[in-house]
């Protein structure tokens, strides 16, 4: 007999509660007034927020955490233990959960249980999930529909990566990285695009498509991006959208204008003009994300005037071209891009702000400096050729060593390997092995007028505050 996640009062314990996906689930469960504890070896503003909401946070992973929590909440009722794919069977806390007889669930099991409670919208796809789900959540929130939100990135306008609403909708980001996407069922599913991005889990693109096919079958309605050939040909959906009117999709655009301050376009719905939008985000991929959000919100019955007003106020998710500050004429921006397609799109958007002379940033930059930390050995190895050709818009490139994310190096692969590959296409390429070396190298390379764009899903952005302090101190000394 399969044991289901209990949302009616049984306590929860999260192993790795500080992760961006785990913390979102923990926040919603905590706000549902259920007893929650969790462990994470890294304290952060996210774990601090959970503690303020009432969760008990342990700063190490140990068997005693579960024993203490079990005694505190109720004798004889063991907590439900939630873990992600990153938690291995040899983890001490995981083993303690098994020994104590606690039911252990993958985080996707909890998300699936929450999706069943609401009229749910689940956003899947290789790229654009966080921005699209954040947009939908923000549009519903601005319209007074008070959604519950569980997404994989922090949205300033929503106060973070999760919220418990009183409305009937739940907006969730649906992650395909470990194959658990197949467990999720939703009233509305969205597929933004399909590429091979997790070679550590999938052997080829067909395996990825199979996972998305199961997800598609589990959704009552599927909103599909027809600009992605794989989606268009294999999973066309019940509702379609495209930036190309010639494709004949249900939702499309024309009169598109990309300027430094954002994007303008006219929106069409099944051949009828809805009106013009202004989106304070750049590049075609963000307009595509907005079109997916429009399709979802229109299907839910929202009027276009409310959608247009909401889009104009959406400033994006954190670590998605996020301005972090400036000093001595150098502007620092943080972006989560870690796949060749994402890098190319983000760098193109940054280049546009320089070439157009119109920027979302406080000042129009003069030079684009791309600082990239590759994420995972498996991804770097699988897409080395694609990565090498992704940095064309940059004037200068600095590559750090690979953020392993728990993987072992399969051989002699390093950031230097990638830097050498990029150097075949780019003249001004540099390599620095670790964060300290990155910081010191940037002291030598950066100059007034630069846009220092930090790219990657690892911890590279930890350098940004130190650089801001360095240049601020230099100014004070002067």
Curated annotation (Swiss-Prot):
Tree of life domain: Bacteria
Reaction catalyzed: UDP-N-acetyl-alpha-D-muramate + L-alanine + ATP = UDP-N-acetyl-alpha-D-muramoyl-L-alanine + ADP + phosphate + H(+)
GO biological process: cell division; cell wall organization; peptidoglycan biosynthetic process; regulation of cell shape
Record's GO cellular component terms: cytoplasm
Keywords: ATP-binding, Cell cycle, Cell division, Cell shape, Cell wall biogenesis/degradation, Cytoplasm, Ligase, Nucleotide-binding, Peptidoglycan synthesis
Cross-referenced Gene3D superfamilies: Mur ligase, C-terminal domain, Mur-like, catalytic domain, NAD(P)-binding Rossmann-like Domain
Family: Belongs to the MurCDEF family.
Identification of the protein by name: UDP-N-acetylmuramate--L-alanine ligase
Species name: Synechococcus sp. (strain ATCC 27144 / PCC 6301 / SAUG 1402/1)
Classification of source organism: Bacteria, Bacillati, Cyanobacteriota, Cyanophyceae, Synechococcales
